[in-house]
């Protein structure tokens, strides 16, 4: 039995297949691996008579942490630490940096016949839909610190929280400390 058909046969009804990417620059062709695997699973579920929804998230609220070599460093260096959705597009073809690079990648989806429902994390954060989950994580930060220690042996300080917030003054997300 094909591996995806096995997954579909073992699955319950109403499955959500989800993948995501941080568009910090040109997306490497290797990132298509997850896209194709998730698409195959979604198709196998549907072929097997299961209800399935294929989602693809764009983590555009992650910070710009480096300027790719193919971009103008002088233009983009001032945006280091800003959420990708708040960094200008390399040209006028997109509203911002994240949409520019995701647009390139999503064009490849079309050529492959992969059609997930695409969502942007900026929209989830700004709409407040994640607020209750953020609150839960902040209230249980000690458990998240314990998980980091157990899984990756990474010790986080007691004042570390599993959340990055944009500074109200400078707009950066990478250097702001939650308190």
Q: What do the PLM-derived regions correspond to, one by one?
A:
Residues 1-29, 40-56, 76-77, 81, ...:
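Non-catalytic terminal extensions that flank enzyme cores
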Residues 25-26, 62-65, 126-129:
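Short catalytic/ligand-binding loop motif for oxyanion handling, primarily in non-cytosolic enzymes
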Residues 29-32, 96:
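Alpha-helix capping and helix-loop boundary segments enriched in small/acidic/polar residues
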Residues 32, 36, 125-127:
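Acidic-and-aromatic substrate-binding clefts and catalytic sites of carbohydrate-active enzymes
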Residues 55-64, 121:
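Short, solvent-exposed turn/loop segments enriched in Gly/Ser/Thr/Pro and often Arg
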Residues 61-79, 133-134:
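Charged, often glycine-rich, active-site loop that binds/positions anionic groups
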Residues 83-179:
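Active-site neighborhoods of enzyme catalytic cores
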